[in-house]
């Protein structure tokens, strides 16, 4: 391991990142709280401000991926479609197999200048996660309980609110509903057999209702669906903790632009269309494992400096008073004060590790297990 790699793996560096993220995140969340005063006066101004405040938080994680870890991303796509990326609203359909696939989705959004306005369809429990979850609340993310009877109305209402959103955005959605594991895959394929659907090797059975309602609600606002199939070279299985340790990965992302008018309006036909899409995604993954590459032309969208600039700004803002406080405590010589300081740091570290744990595959939700079993029994 070289000197830079050794430095990046040090716990002290991780604590600095944790402190900057938590301190700046809570400051930004507080500012977002006060922006609620704007909502009844000027809703669009509220949205534009929160779009930029959101960028201040999410770009810190993208900075870790792109600058600290140095992870590279090659996009395989049609050059004609590439020219439209970042210039239109789009629904981005991502496979859900890796712990950092959400971060790669954010990186894609950042490369095309849409990170601040990017939306997700996320489980409602994430709305209570400090900093990121609260940020999502203020930027009108679409939350679901993953119980269709409850979500039918609430998700449609949330999506309708995005029809007049003033910023360009990618709406990121994992149609599989939960992250891929072998156990979930086995149960999902039992459901596929029971429904007479083709077997998928590298994906779970897509959940069509959420996708159909998203397309229906955003039609004539969103221009296209971007079908994105993600994989990593050398059979690597990247983790957020690995990114924090500065480990470099190389992502390959196959992106197909599908005009929204090509997607059926009827829900049943839309469902059949999505199942066919996932059969094609599965074939692309199989081809990648066989050849190590995706179809179409490889392109590397340039890494933008703004994520790094944003982090340096917040780091300088919150670290200077912190070090002043630290020096004053050391000079005081009070054992109680120092013990309190260490305790606060320990709690902060545990808190960030807990947020990282939300992304870990082996600690993921049991949704894909229990819900698929229920469908199998129906």
UniProtKB/Swiss-Prot annotation:
A motif (HXXXXD motif) lies at residues 96-101. Widely expressed with highest levels in skeletal muscle, followed by heart, liver, prostate and thymus. Belongs to the 1-acyl-sn-glycerol-3-phosphate acyltransferase family. It catalyses: a 1-acyl-sn-glycero-3-phosphate + an acyl-CoA = a 1,2-diacyl-sn-glycero-3-phosphate + CoA; (4Z,7Z,10Z,13Z,16Z,19Z)-docosahexaenoyl-CoA + 1-hexadecanoyl-sn-glycero-3-phosphate = 1-hexadecanoyl-2-(4Z,7Z,10Z,13Z,16Z,19Z-docosahexaenoyl)-sn-glycero-3-phosphate + CoA; 1-octadecanoyl-sn-glycero-3-phosphate + (9Z,12Z)-octadecadienoyl-CoA = 1-octadecanoyl-2-(9Z,12Z-octadecadienoyl)-sn-glycero-3-phosphate + CoA; 1-octadecanoyl-sn-glycero-3-phosphate + (4Z,7Z,10Z,13Z,16Z,19Z)-docosahexaenoyl-CoA = 1-octadecanoyl-2-(4Z,7Z,10Z,13Z,16Z,19Z-docosahexaenoyl)-sn-glycero-3-phosphate + CoA. It is a multi-pass membrane protein. It is found in: Endoplasmic reticulum membrane. Pfam families: Acyltransf_C, Acyltransferase. It is an enzyme of class 2 (transferase). The keyword Lipid metabolism applies. The HXXXXD motif is essential for acyltransferase activity and may constitute the binding site for the phosphate moiety of the glycerol-3-phosphate. Converts 1-acyl-sn-glycerol-3-phosphate (lysophosphatidic acid or LPA) into 1,2-diacyl-sn-glycerol-3-phosphate (phosphatidic acid or PA) by incorporating an acyl moiety at the sn-2 position of the glycerol backbone. Exhibits high acyl-CoA specificity for polyunsaturated fatty acyl-CoA, especially docosahexaenoyl-CoA (22:6-CoA, DHA-CoA). It comes from the Eukaryota. GO terms for molecular function: 1-acylglycerol-3-phosphate O-acyltransferase activity. The chain crosses the membrane at residues 11-31, 125-145, 307-327, 338-358. The keyword Lipid biosynthesis applies. One of its GO terms (cellular component) is endoplasmic reticulum membrane. GO terms for biological process: CDP-diacylglycerol biosynthetic process; phosphatidic acid biosynthetic process; phospholipid biosynthetic process. Its EC number is 2.3.1.51. This is 1-acyl-sn-glycerol-3-phosphate acyltransferase delta. Keywords: Acyltransferase, Endoplasmic reticulum, Lipid biosynthesis, Lipid metabolism, Membrane, Phospholipid biosynthesis, Phospholipid metabolism, Transferase, Transmembrane, Transmembrane helix. Pathway: Phospholipid metabolism; CDP-diacylglycerol biosynthesis; CDP-diacylglycerol from sn-glycerol 3-phosphate: step 2/3.
């Amino acid at each position: 391991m070289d000197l830079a790699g050794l430095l990046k793996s040090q716990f002290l560096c991780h604590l600095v990142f944790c402190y900057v993220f938590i301190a700046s995140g809570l400051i930004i969340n507080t500012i977002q709280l006060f922006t609620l005063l704007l909502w009844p006066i000027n809703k669009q101004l509220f949205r534009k401000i929160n779009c930029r405040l959101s960028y201040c938080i999410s770009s810190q994680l993208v900075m870790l991926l792109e600058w600290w870890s140095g992870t590279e991303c090659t996009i395989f796509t049609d050059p004609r479609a590439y020219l439209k990326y970042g210039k239109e609203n789009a629904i981005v359909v991502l496979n859900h197999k890796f712990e950092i696939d959400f971060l790669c989705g954010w990186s894609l959004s950042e490369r095309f200048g849409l990170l601040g306005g990017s939306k997700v369809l996320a489980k409602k429990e994430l709305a209570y996660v400090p900093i990121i979850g609260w940020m999502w609340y203020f930027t009108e993310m679409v939350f679901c309980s993953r119980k269709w009877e409850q979500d039918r109305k609430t998700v449609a209402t949330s999506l309708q609110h995005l029809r007049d959103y003033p910023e360009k955005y990618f709406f990121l959605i994992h149609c599989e509903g939960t992250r891929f594991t072998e156990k979930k895959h086995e149960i999902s394929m039992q459901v596929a057999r029971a429904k007479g659907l083709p077997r998928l090797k590298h994906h779970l059975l897509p959940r069509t209702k959420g996708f159909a309602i998203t397309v229906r609600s955003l039609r004539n606002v969103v221009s296209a669906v971007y079908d994105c199939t993600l994989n990593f070279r050398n059979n690597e299985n990247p983790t957020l903790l690995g990114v924090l340790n500065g480990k470099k990965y190389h992502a390959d992302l196959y992106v197909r632009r599908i005009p929204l008018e090509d997607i059926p309006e009827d829900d049943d036909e839309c469902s059949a269309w999505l199942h066919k899409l996932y059969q094609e995604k599965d074939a692309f993954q199989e081809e990648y494992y066989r050849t190590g590459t995706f179809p179409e032309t490889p392109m590397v969208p340039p890494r933008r400096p703004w994520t790094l600039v944003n982090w340096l700004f917040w780091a300088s803002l919150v670290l200077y008073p912190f070090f002043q406080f630290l020096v004053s405590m050391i000079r005081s010589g009070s054992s109680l004060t120092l013990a309190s300081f260490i305790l606060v740091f320990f709690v902060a570290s545990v808190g960030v590790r807990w947020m990282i744990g939300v992304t870990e595959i082996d600690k993921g939700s049991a949704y894909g297990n229990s819900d698929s079993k229920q469908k199998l029994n129906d």
